[in-house]
């Protein structure tokens, strides 16, 4: 038994160290190298097999001492590993290149050999979808025709199906999944990745489902070790607690406005302009909504250098030469910064053009998509999107403000300068549509605010006459503008996060009953304030959108924060930990929502990233990180208590860390596998050994060790505290280190 346990520990440690080394090697040797020589190599699979078999035998030998919930947890991981083994043994992958009208029944595998598909597939059409109003590519769509010939004996007819594949839409036929990978320079050919895994995905999903059920059972079962740890963590009464001071400082360094003349657009005129309605994202909305999204998209927040989003947006319309030189476009990726030739992360629109008036990222992006270089695509996509957002504004796609109702009662919206065709309009209306924005620009530049206000009023009146059936009421417009202003304020969320984190730390470490009572009272007040704030936001969003706010990742996160607060306030009297951590969980959900809204989807770009699964995945992972952070802080306090020979306090804090460890590990496990499901639905594979997901797995394995009570070294409180403190380095590496030092498809920097 002892030797078997040592084998498990040695193999688990070896796996963790190998995974760490692999991510470092990948940054220098490339993904293909580590995938071939480490991740999918036979020796690494054997190592995982030894670990799984040894763990299974050890559990069976100790099954009388292991609860049903713990058995289910371990069984689920074994099933997940079995699914991975099945995929490794039976799954097929390869590439398929087709020209227009060409038919094939084979694919090329990783070794370059041709393998039969069992059906015929032909390229019906390949199409590049551009950003609206521009010639810049937004998506790549392949339309295939797949056909399986019927059996001559059974006289079955042929089974023919049309399949559409795009960047974020996987095509499927007879168990084979098609993923868009590249295209030919003449637009007459396409390259597709093919993946066929008839058994592995199903087995793995079964393991995921069993894991979720077993983790929930473990958390709420009365017979598991977590209950004992909970009682032990709260057993010490009357001990003197020392104050913990946490200083959180946030510094934002923004580039200063360039020292040149510019048109100072009056804030009042900009606000009036912001209430004009436009057709935006298939919805009639005030320009203020477009302005808020536009400015937030470019610089990460809804204002710039003290100017409101309305003023900045109006500036991009009425004072183009100046704003094209302002370095307000945030470029996060180093590769994009290098290609644009900028120092730091701030660029102007002028930085996107070379001396010959060529778009600097055009050639690298086309080559990346042609070659299927997903890493380079990812590095340049965000900068390219921001560039094209500005071009869309110039093309009038964000300023469709003139409605026209035809004889069929269908309402069309036109932008200033857009060809009107043969519309039944009198000469006065035609002149108004064509010239009103020119007159408004002239008034704004000349500082004639009275005339500008009058023109805005006329545009607004025209909208209500020509688009009466669809133009929102004045109350709805003012409500949406008010919602945008409230929602753009990020400081309340940072305040909630700071206060809830401080209160959680105080509630978990402070042992003085009177101070605990005060902390719990403040937690309740904070929960009520957060609930009122979140309810107002959700209600306003519900009203202005006309539907329940649960349609995208941002709304899902806000709703989850609201639901968490409801549960907290309903159950806080009976379950103290819910009172302690409910506001913190809610604050993290609001933080994820804020991060999501910090990169708003002005156009339908990368719709897969709007998946609620992705938002839940990020939220769950982040909350596990928060708990790991708390355990690191508790570890510091525990080591201080050990140094001062406060044995009782040291033991209690160790029990508290172990108590928090259960939900933390459960959350990171659930988060990882929700992410795997999302990846499978979106990209065709549930696990790709990306550096970020590999380090998340490393973190989960590291934090899983203290859950096993038979590891003698961790039974000492001092060792537990030291382990928790050092283990947090893996969290820092996962969240920050991977983004800045390693390669990969994830980036949260």
Q: Could you tell me what each predicted segment is?
A:
Residues 1-749:
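Solvent-exposed, non-transmembrane regions of integral membrane proteins
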